């Protein structure tokens, strides 16, 4: 039986990505403080909830870590398997899925924004800057952070396809769009109810808590 080498390399890339994605600093920070971050605040073990619960420094650390882990997974897979034309895309997608659905945390993970940013950064600084610009415009217009990963998970794969001509890789990247949307259904419901946090919480946390009707937990 002949073994398909590229298939094995893609599988290895997926394993690297998923294992890296499961590393969750927000959850660890919560444990060190004596609580499960998935049961406090928004319930999301990611940067935004860490900012709400522990402040900007902790939240920015979580964001930087999550961006970095995706960038490392993509870069490492591309370096290890240069002849596999979808190694980076497979690793990046698996990292996002590992972050959102980590086996180590009962498949209850984050929502993928920072990891999406990290995989894009690993492919190209130009791609990252372009997506950052357009998503910043969206964020300024709507003020809802949750809309960024939803649109990014659709927009970047299309952009990547036109930029590289690697539509197979783009299809792999685009496969996270539905899981990302599913992760944000509750956010969309809260937008409709006027209870979703806006980016304003970065400088007006108390105002956002009052506006949304959330109670800050001790």
Region roles according to the model:
Residues 58-64, 68-103, 126, 135-136:
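Nucleotide and nucleotide-moiety/phosphate-recognizing core
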Residues 36-46, 104-117, 144-150:
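Short, non-helical or kinked segments that cap or interrupt transmembrane helices
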Residues 51-54, 77-80, 113-142, 155-163:
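Interfacial segments of multi-pass membrane proteins
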Residues 8-33:
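N-terminal signal-anchor transmembrane alpha helix
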Residues 19-27, 93-103, 178-188:
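Transmembrane alpha-helical segments that form the membrane-embedded catalytic/substrate-channel core
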Residues 1-12, 74-90, 121-127, 160-172:
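Helix-coil boundary and interhelical linker segments in multi-pass alpha-helical membrane proteins
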Residues 28-59, 109, 189-215:
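Cytosolic, membrane-interface loops and tails of multi-pass inner-membrane proteins
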Residues 145-152, 164-176:
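Loop-to-transmembrane alpha-helix initiation sites
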């Amino acid at each position: 039986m002949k073994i398909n080498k590229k298939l094995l390399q893609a599988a290895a890339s997926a394993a690297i990505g998923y294992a890296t994605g499961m590393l969750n600093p927000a959850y660890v920070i919560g444990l060190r403080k004596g609580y499960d971050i998935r049961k406090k605040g928004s319930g999301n073990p990611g940067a935004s909830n860490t900012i709400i619960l522990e402040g900007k420094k902790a939240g920015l650390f979580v964001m930087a870590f999550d961006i970095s882990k995706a960038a490392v997974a993509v870069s490492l897979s591309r370096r290890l398997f240069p002849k596999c034309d979808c190694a980076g895309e497979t690793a990046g997608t698996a990292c996002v899925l590992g972050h959102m659905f980590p086996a180590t945390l009962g498949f209850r993970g984050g929502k993928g924004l920072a990891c999406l940013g990290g995989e894009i950064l690993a492919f190209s600084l130009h791609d990252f800057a372009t997506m950052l610009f357009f998503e910043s415009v969206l964020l300024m217009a709507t003020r809802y952070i949750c809309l960024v990963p939803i649109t990014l998970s659709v927009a970047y794969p299309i952009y990547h396809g036109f930029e590289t001509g690697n539509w197979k890789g783009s299809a792999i990247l685009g496969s996270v769009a539905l899981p990302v949307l599913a992760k944000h259904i509750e956010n969309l419901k809260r937008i409709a109810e006027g209870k979703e946090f806006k980016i304003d919480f970065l400088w007006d946390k108390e105002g956002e808590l009052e506006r949304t009707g959330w109670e800050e937990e001790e």
